[in-house]
A protein has these predicted regions:
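Active-site beta->alpha N-cap acidic-glycine motif
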Residues: 1-36, 44, 48-65, 156-158
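Acidic-and-aromatic substrate-binding clefts and catalytic sites of carbohydrate-active enzymes
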Residues: 3-11, 36-40, 69-75, 99-104, ...
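His/Asp/Glu-enriched short active-site or ligand-binding loop at hydrolase and phosphoryl-transfer sites
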Residues: 74, 79-116, 148-160
Length: 182
């Protein structure tokens, strides 16, 4: 889930594009500039998602529809309606977060990986912070030891109906002890 306003994606598009086009990684929409969508009117929601979609298409040649992740996990019926009107019908939430923002220690990140990296779980992590890099081998070992496989959002949801996805979706509000993920 990318924000195209973050320059790192454009700087590394030549490395990422082949992975996206081959299906090894999936790009989905996290809005252009990362606003709380519940503070925007319908046109603002559409503009954030569509501008990001246009950038994704330009960089990677693929559409991110129908998936989007609302920044901070915040959405309401008005956001879902506006997003749906332009083809973003599947908000993707998470069951836990690595909490890998810049202020979090590698030890705490790994403890969160132990807690949340379980079967059938969506775990939120970030590409724009380096705090997880020193423990990537350890995290990969945890994933391997647990027999887990990383999959794309498309693989995770498969052919589930909108009603099935909505019924199975985790709460959009992180638990109180967690930092608010972005």
């Amino acid at each position: 889930f990318i924000n195209a306003s973050y320059t790192g994606f454009k700087e590394h598009v030549s490395l990422l594009r082949p992975l996206v086009q081959s299906g090894q990684i999936q790009v989905a929409n996290h809005t252009y500039s990362h606003p709380d969508l519940t503070t925007l009117d319908a046109e603002g929601v559409k503009e954030e998602l569509q501008r990001n979609e246009d950038e994704i298409m330009s960089m990677f040649g693929v559409s991110s529809k129908p998936y989007f992740r609302p920044p901070y996990g915040r959405y309401n019926d008005a956001v879902l309606k506006a997003a749906g009107e332009i083809g973003f019908t599947r908000p993707v939430m998470w069951n836990g977060t690595t909490g890998d923002e810049a202020k979090t220690s590698s030890r705490v990140i790994y403890m969160r990986c132990i807690r949340y990296m379980l079967p059938q779980q969506i775990v939120l992590g970030h590409l724009n912070y380096e705090t997880i890099i020193p423990i990537l081998d350890k995290v990969k070992g945890l994933i391997d030891d647990r027999g887990l496989t990383a999959v794309t959002v498309r693989d995770y949801y498969g052919d589930a109906s909108e009603e099935e996805i909505k019924a199975a979706a985790p709460s959009p509000t992180p638990t109180p002890e967690e930092n608010t993920p972005s």
